[in-house]
A protein has these predicted regions:
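Polyanion-binding surfaces on beta-sheet-dominated domains and ring/shell assemblies
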Residues: 1-91
Length: 91
């Protein structure tokens, strides 16, 4: 899960940054970009998109869900918390 990936990242890189940015939020479709930065270097970038109302959680929290997915993807691209794919089914 993303929370475990964040904990692991913080343990490895206590001074690292996880920077999220809403790239677009038009007509209920949100796109978020996440950059993982350590020592002023971008180590990974992840993107995610979510549609308002497309699932139970997205009825109220599609932007938050999109941000979490983007963070999880960026950390996965770094190799944190992946076994077989960047995102798990639950994520």
């Amino acid at each position: 899960m993303v929370n475990e990936r964040i904990k692991f990242f913080r343990g490895l890189y206590p001074n690292g940054s996880i920077i999220t940015e809403i790239v677009s939020n038009i007509e209920g479709v949100c796109i978020v970009k996440t950059s993982i930065i350590v020592d002023e270097k971008v180590l990974a970038v992840g993107h995610a998109s979510e549609k308002d109302g497309s699932s139970f959680i997205n009825k109220t929290s599609y932007i938050e869900n999109c941000e979490t997915s983007s963070v999880g993807r960026a950390l996965g691209i770094m190799g944190i918390g992946i076994d077989t794919s960047i995102a798990s089914f639950e994520e």
